[in-house]
Amino acid sequence: MQRQGIHGNILGENILKAGGMAMLMFTQVQQPSSLEEAHALMIKQKMAPVLAGGCWTRLGNRKWPMVIDLSGLGLRYIEEDDVEFRIGAMATQRDVEVYEPFQTFANGAFPKAVKDILGVQFRNMATMGGSVAARFGFSDIIPLLLALQAEVRLFEGGRMSVEAYLSYGKRDLLIEIIVPKQDVPVAIEALRKSTSDFPYLTGSVRRDDSGYSVYIGCRPGKPIRAVTACDILNEKGIDALEEAAEAIEGDVTFQSNSHASAEYRLSMAKNMFKRLVKEVDTWK
């Protein structure tokens, strides 16, 4: 079923009063009833934003001619089997935060990753799919998914790693996030000026049979792997931690913005790198 021609000034105000957030204005809303229909709309209406939780779309004063609402596609779920978790694109950050198996999986990394994202009211609305699809550099969630070697499932692109998705150029429908059940040490960290602020630096680390993989995000760009630093650590071991941390300067590009300068981010990234590596080394 597809609805057209609903006046967004009325519907939008009702939605946003319930959420207590900024105004979202649109002229028309499309509510596809199938994945096929949703994807076709995304391809046809290239300028129409996809409305998941709507927490970012509503920022600013723009009035959208059309939005595509995914709430009728049945994508709000968290499932698991013996080998993986599957997080539907419309599952909220709060759903992930309180999901019982995530309290212990990866040493509680999922609740830790989302607990400082604004307030509970926001996390009740912000979706996991929207958080990943937006590919914001300041994301708390993406560094964790990289460390967990998570994948996404797309309507057209199929399954691909989150790392590959960060560079995926097509407009495609994100259906779910897939997290393998691997018992490997991971750690995450996000640095903020205040509890409710956006982070000015994020990081994550994974240690498995192939060695260490450390990702630095909010540079303020998207998270990337500190390749040279990890190579030094994997070749020389933990005794070369200081040398590896210094290699971040040539590995990762930082920029300045209103949250932090490039120089400050670099300094903090070196210290974060050392803390993250030491944390996974304490895992038994």
Q: Where are the regions a protein language model picked out?
A:
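C-terminal structural segment of proteins
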Residues: 2-284
